[in-house]
Amino acid sequence: MKYENKKDIAIFRGAVYQKHRKEFFDSYFGRTFCDIGDTSKQPSQWKKNFLNKKEQMKYKFIISLEGNDVASNLKWAMNSNSLVLAPKITCETWFMEGTLKPNYHFALIDNDNLTTVIEHFISHPKDALEIINNAHQYVKKFLDKKKEFYIGILVLTKYFYYSGQLDLNKDECKREILELIK
């Protein structure tokens, strides 16, 4: 679905156990410009029904909040035609979140500015589309399964080498890697 045809609302579904998520919900639950809900099994004043990815992608804005570690919706949300709204990212995975640039790959939010950010992008859809395009370009490099496989082999080789589980000489290493790539 094209960005222009989506609902002018921010969406979030996820478990709300952590202090930072609770503070976010205290600030924004029940506001008209966002539909956020706690989908955990625990009793909660923020309880809402689960929404799958397809349902969430009907909204112009997808909120991505870290939980105990990385925000698990970040990758698929950045590959959608919705604008990702996220606080400063602190966790790092294979996706190299530390290289993501706020307001270039996603729109930076906090517990005070969500209204302003949403209003800005509703009024300036070209700004949103530019960030969405940048996000798509970033995600694209992770979609090449063959390349990701070879990078994984190289990472494992380095891990085994530096942990003392693999003894390599350069010629032997090159030969073995070339054999794997065939």
Q: Which residues make up each language-model segment?
A:
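Phosphate-/polyanion-interacting regions in eukaryotic proteins
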Residues: M1-N52
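Catalytic binding pocket for nucleotide-activated donors in carbohydrate/polymer assembly enzymes
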Residues: K54-L180
